[in-house]
Amino acid sequence: MATAKTIDLTGKVVREIELPDVFDVDYRPDLIKKAVLAAQANRLQPYGPRLYAGMETSARGWGSGRGTSHVPRLVNSSRAARVPHARGGRRAHPPKPEADRSEKVNTKERRYAIRSAIAATRDPTLVSLRGHIFEAELPIVTENALEDLDKTKQVIEFLQAIGVYEDVLRAKYGRHIRAGRGKLRGRKYKHKKSVLIVAGESAPILKAARNLSGVDVATVDSLNAELLAPGTHAGRLTIWTESAVEKLEGAFQ
């Protein structure tokens, strides 16, 4: 069974604890990617054109005998309309709002993906490949006193003490304008992910830390593959409290 060093709010090691078996699970990037993509697909909002888009016109066909193509044309004009190959006409095969774009994942696969992503948080190689900046030894396990921090300033001081605040700054100054049409559709900027803090239920830190750039907060019960592996890439820089680690015992089986 693997062990981890528990640190206090100043970054000093206070004791060593045994980690649950979930931290020894094999790394399965295929299952992690499958679970994350399914979660993203299930958030999609139905979309499609208006029911009569491109059809609101008085155009009608001339029929045969005029030596022209049999396409609907505007009244008192030779301009074609309504058909897909005409300017301003309807789309030939538009997306259907009634289409089912959701994806299903087997329960055992989804749970294994979460366990595998949890185990990846203690692998320095995977965490570094995600671009995280850290000096602390992984996995980062803290005393339960961390849960009582109720001011964002206190959280920043703690992150500086353990050597991971540079990762928050990386997310803060790493914001950039998105390429493509998405910038016109309410998602102008792309944001980087930094630290994930996992604490107990109703802990004050869940509110104190959530406004830091790229930081996500969660309880063990609310963990999912996307939180642990943003963009399908496992190895997120994660801070666990002792109570959260204890609750991982037997979780996601």
Swiss-Prot record:
Organism, per UniProt?
Methanosarcina barkeri (strain Fusaro / DSM 804)
- Stretches for region Disordered: 61-107
* Superkingdom classification of source: Archaea
Q: Which function does this protein serve? A: One of the primary rRNA binding proteins, this protein initially binds near the 5'-end of the 23S rRNA. It is important during the early stages of 50S assembly. It makes multiple contacts with different domains of the 23S rRNA in the assembled 50S subunit and ribosome. Forms part of the polypeptide exit tunnel.
Q: Which gene encodes it?
A: rpl4
For bias type Basic residues, the affected ranges are 82-94
Q: Biological process GO annotation list?
A: translation
Q: Which PANTHER family match?
A: 60S RIBOSOMAL PROTEIN L4
What family is this protein classified in?
A: Belongs to the universal ribosomal protein uL4 family.
Record bears the keyword DNA repair = no
Against InterPro entries, the record matches this protein to: Ribosomal_uL4, Ribosomal_uL4_dom_sf, Ribosomal_uL4_euk/arch, Ribosomall_uL4-arc
Q: Name one GO molecular function term.
A: rRNA binding
Q: State how it assembles.
A: Part of the 50S ribosomal subunit.
Instruction: Extract one GO cellular component term from the record.
Output: ribosome
Q: Where is the composition biased (Basic and acidic residues)?
A: 95-107
The record's section on SUPFAM superfamilies has: Ribosomal protein L4
Q: Which UniProt keywords apply?
A: Ribonucleoprotein, Ribosomal protein, RNA-binding, rRNA-binding
Full protein name: Large ribosomal subunit protein uL4
